[in-house]
Amino acid sequence: GIIYTCNPSRSCKEKVEELAAEIPLVIINNREELLEIDAVELNNAKPGRPMARHLLELGHRHVAFVSPPLTSKQGQRLKRVEGFVREFEEAGYGDGVIVKSADEDLDEVIPSMDSEYKMGYYLTKELLRENKNLTAIVGMNDMIAFGIMDAVLESKLRIPADISVVGCDNTVYSSFRSISLTTIDHYVP
């Protein structure tokens, strides 16, 4: 059998369904309503909450969440953002959260580490121009957070003294000593 660990892109959904008809296949990540394939769904709202709680505990009240496009196709991405925003709202600071997502036309592009890094970088540059009072920026995932970090540092700001940066997924890169990214494992209990 096959364990498929991400949602198939539109361009390969048909192939994945054909494969599932021949070989036992399960998707671990998000339940895609349009696919007739077994799936183990992750709770994508869950990681957003501890990221927000961590920042609230550090005293952050003006934060941004940087994301790939938040389209109907990417409902799971939206759940992570919603969990983050909900935590700030429940603490009484919902007005201090900015959600900055990439243009919807980028949703048709198969995401790569390079494109996610660039999204984090360019969206953060925009955020820093538009919002001088931000004290923390969160990336939907670690690759976006790496782009955020470079944009912050290039703007002559210090991490975490001036702006805190948080990622999600706890990728191997986040543990490199030279990077020092605060990140959360997606599989939060």
Model-predicted regions and their roles:
Residues K13-P189:
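Bacterial carbohydrate/catabolite-sensing allosteric modules
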